[in-house]
Amino acid sequence: MHNIFKGLITALITPFKDNKLDLYALERIVKHQIKHEVDAVLIAGSTGESSSLSFEEYKLLLQTSVEIVNKCIPIISGCSSNNTTYARALAAESTKIGVDGFMASPPSYVKPTQHGIYKHFEALHEACNLPIMLYSAPTRSGVDFSDETILRLSKLPRILALKDCGVDLERPLRIRATVKKDFNILTGNDEVVLAFNAQGGVGWTSVASNIVPNICKELLEKWNKNDTKGALEIHQKLLPLYTALFVESNPIPIKYAAHYLGLCENEIRPPLTEASDSAKKQIENIITSLSIKI
């Protein structure tokens, strides 16, 4: 099975207007990614406010994204839930709609054991025939995969990758030493992309690339061509942007940044709230200093 989980994957925001999906803005957002040749887009992940979506909204979001992309790049859907039955339904619907793969985290809040995490993903694996990326987000889930559980899950034929949002930079080396060769490991933290890939990662699921996909793509291309100096120069330039985009809970800052650049409304669903005035100012200043334009 072809492994689509590599390179630059943008964790897309979900645009809203008047508390409904803004499909016109979604088209702008997705086409901006296609224009700059990202390797894939992730729909309805944490950055996409997936927990705020109804099942009908989830289906509409995926269906519209598939139509817009029209097979130009792979689409990855988020299928995280603390209810295994509901997560299976998301995976089955993703398959029916025609996405290219999906991502899921361990069930949040309920704090399953490692055996429970394994059984959850085994159930998702059985629910569809799509490639799957594990999503390690311990600060959001409250639990994480152990190295042993990752190894067990990697033996299931369609579990092909791990997106790691943790801070253990030795983990890619440890995992790489045990899993099958075609199992990919990507970082979900913009600020550690180079350090992570130096330790065995093969890509990056990025928040910042919602607004600077061209720069993020250039950074990764330089890294992959062994132009370490060039990659570091770009990374250093982007560090203040990474900081600004996480000055408050994701996706609050990136939603405002996208709004400021004309991609969408600055509408975010409760219990999240709009960026504070100080956060807005910080975001505006870095966008101006980097001359970011859409």
From Swiss-Prot:
Biochemical pathway: Amino-acid biosynthesis; L-lysine biosynthesis via DAP pathway; (S)-tetrahydrodipicolinate from L-aspartate: step 3/4
EC class: lyase
Localization of this protein: Cytoplasm
Gene Ontology molecular functions: (R,S)-4-hydroxy-2-oxoglutarate aldolase activity; 4-hydroxy-tetrahydrodipicolinate synthase activity
Protein name per the record: 4-hydroxy-tetrahydrodipicolinate synthase
Keywords (A to Z) from UniProt: Amino-acid biosynthesis, Cytoplasm, Diaminopimelate biosynthesis, Lyase, Lysine biosynthesis, Schiff base
Pfam family, one: DHDPS
Oligomeric and partner information: Homotetramer; dimer of dimers.
Catalytic reaction list: L-aspartate 4-semialdehyde + pyruvate = (2S,4S)-4-hydroxy-2,3,4,5-tetrahydrodipicolinate + H2O + H(+)
Natural source organism: Rickettsia conorii (strain ATCC VR-613 / Malish 7)
Residues that coordinate or bind pyruvate: 47, 205
GO terms classed as biological process: diaminopimelate biosynthetic process; glyoxylate catabolic process; lysine biosynthetic process via diaminopimelate
InterPro entries: Aldolase_TIM, DapA, DapA-like, Schiff_base-form_aldolases_AS, Schiff_base-form_aldolases_CS
Biological role: Catalyzes the condensation of (S)-aspartate-beta-semialdehyde [(S)-ASA] and pyruvate to 4-hydroxy-tetrahydrodipicolinate (HTPA).
